[in-house]
Amino acid sequence: MTDAAKPGTTDDTDICLMLSLPERIQQMNIGVLRSMLQKGCIPLVVTVNQPYRILMKRYAKEGLDPQKIFIIDAVTQYSGGMCDDGQNVRYVTNPANLTDLGIAITEMLKQNPDQRKCIVFDSVSMLLIHIPSVTASKFLHFVMNKLRLTNVDGIFLCVEKGLDPVILTQLSSFVDRIVEFDSPEQGAGLATITS
């Protein structure tokens, strides 16, 4: 595991870019959520990767309580799927609709105001398929600063070799640290993010 912390970080939030091999990104998602829930943190998953219904089934299969996980789904409507009603889900028409995505994030952050929350963005790599890299970089910078201003931790998942070096450099300057994900147990090592 490589974990490079940025010196001089003094605030209470932790913004982390987690890199994984493509075949391990789902394990990374599960490991991160498991760690958050064990620490009493409310996970808010922003998915531009898989639909809400699929994620909920996977989380339940992995022993995670779907009722404790909030989802912003930018995939279901885009793919022509049916949107399930639910208190823990907000739908955005497509991953390129950054205005609605930003509004949904803001609204979900306002829910449960007295509880510690953490955003998991799944995934930066998939977002880059839908929008130009410059636009993605600006949007992610906006989201990361919103998290800092609201004292919410953020974990941004990404396929390790899926980023242009320029984008990786930009994101590296936005985050507090970069973690290379090696195993499902590593999600438990994220105590500094969710404690």
Task: Label the model's feature ranges.
Residues V152-D153, C158-S195:
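Phosphate-binding/switch region of NTP-binding enzymes
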Residues G81-F142:
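Phosphate-binding/switch loop-helix module in NTP-utilizing enzymes
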Residues L17, L44, C118-F121, I155:
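Structural motif
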Residues P51-M56, S79-G80, L163-V166:
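Short, charged/polar "capping" segments at the starts of alpha-helices
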Residues A136-G162:
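Substrate-engagement module of ASCE P-loop NTPases
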Residues M1-R58:
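Glycine-rich P-loop/Walker A and Walker A-like loops and their local beta1-loop-alpha1 context
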Residues A4-P7, T13, K61-P95:
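Nucleotide-state-sensitive switch-loop elements of NTP-binding domains
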